[in-house]
Amino acid sequence: MAGIGFELKRLFRRKGLFATMRAYGYAGIVCTGPMLLGVLLQVGILVLCGLWGVGRANQDLLVCMVTYTLLASLTLTSFFSMPVTRFLADMLFAEREDEILPSFWGSNAIMLVAGTVLYGIFLLFSGATLLQGLLCLWLFNIMIVNWNGTSYLTAIKDYRGILCSFAAAIGVACLCALAALALGLPPVEGLLASIALGYGVMLAWDVVLLYRYFPQSDRSPWLYLRWLDQFMPLALTGLFTNLGLFAHLVIIWAGPIGVQVKGLFYGAPYHDVPALIAFLTILVTSVNFVVSVEVNFYPRYRDYYSLFNDGGVVGDIVVAEEEMLATLNRELRFCALKQLFVTAAVISLETTVLSALPLGFNNLMHGYFRTLCVGYGLYAVGNTVLLILLYFTDYKGAVLASGLFAGVAGLATAVSLLLSQQFYGFGFLLGAAVFFIVALLRLDTYTANLPYRILSQQPIVATDKTGWFTELGRVLDRVEQRYEDKRVGGEPRSAFERMVVRLYQKHWGGSDDR
């Protein structure tokens, strides 16, 4: 992300209000694409539903199905996202670009198979109709490829291409939704298909961008699986962070204010709407991290580590460390202050602004919104500190902080269900506070003796960690090689093909007629 941050930084050098708004718009979309796209699509579709007079029950079911599909796809990809990003960075550093596209399709294949089985089982018992279930599964698979592609797209630094695919997805989805409503199609099914088509356009656009920048090759698509074993803490960090961010929503659905929409599809409008709007307040920190914290910190970080790699003297290393940590402390302080100002401003104005909107906010919802604004603000700053921990390869600290975030947020939210409804948002707030404090303390202790961490905590002999994922990659390589050998040799591969060959040989061909 630092690379694309430098590209976006050029936009911020342009003067004028419009140029500044344009720069923040680019940065916001690039940095928070998945969730922001989900929010904007849902809002756009709901506006069309309101204008067309779609029933409230159908609107609620549509929102639940899209929300479930969005959260399920983000949770699955969160386990693979960081190791895949690390694999991508390593391949680019080693100038092995021919490994990138095969790994993209290999990672997609693993996630699509696992996700289709798991989410398909849920949909089977969810109470959705066959068509609704198939549409949800279709949308789920498209989302997986999109979220996985986001990791690869940041490497090409084409923020305009990302923006165009983003805008095309929203435009196509809204146009298809309008056409479905005008044709009188069933609203839930028609709008689900429209959203899937919108995400499908984004998928096709992103794949074209990837094929434009990376070479095609016949390298193994399963090489990246070794990185899952090698960097399992990264996978767990991504998963725990995602669980901490979204688990409280699911737990609230099972509480007293939860509403059963249909079958296993639940919602809690009094809590979900404030949470959705409060989540948008972290955009400032997400954008600031990419265009300010990383852009200003990374050059100092690079210079410091280059002194170790290129034989720098002790005096230069000490000076470079002081400059790097001073820059880091300054940027983190500014980042926290910006988030504090945004959170305070939003809380101050929310009663006036939200009451004027047709969202049906009551006193309980206003309370949830204020609580969740503080919680998401703490999460945003804590996540920034977590990413800096990953810069210093403190994977254990990252797993500890994210694991406590997921555990405390989930457990505290479950306990809050036993209390008055006014306290429901405090579970997530407590988890976010623990996340922020633990990550900050870990960063402080880790950087207090940085040369020791770099020189003395590394293994003397480099070893490759192998495990279940590495073995899975080897098995898939053997299967693929066997398949390819049969294809080249002309032998039928499947039972269906063998049956066709037997029928052909019996009635029309000879034994040597391949």
Q: Language-model segments: which ranges?
A:
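Hydrophobic alpha-helical transmembrane segments
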Residues: 165-211, 422-445
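Small-residue-rich midsections of specific transmembrane alpha-helices
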Residues: 63-89, 242, 246, 275-300
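Alpha-helical transmembrane segments of multi-pass membrane transporters/permeases
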Residues: 153-179, 389-411
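Hydrophobic faces of transmembrane alpha-helices in multi-pass small-molecule transporters and flippases
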Residues: 20-36, 163, 220-247, 332-341
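Transmembrane helical elements of multi-pass membrane transporters/channels
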Residues: 194-198, 202-294
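N-terminal membrane topogenesis motif
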Residues: 1-42, 60, 64, 225-234, ...
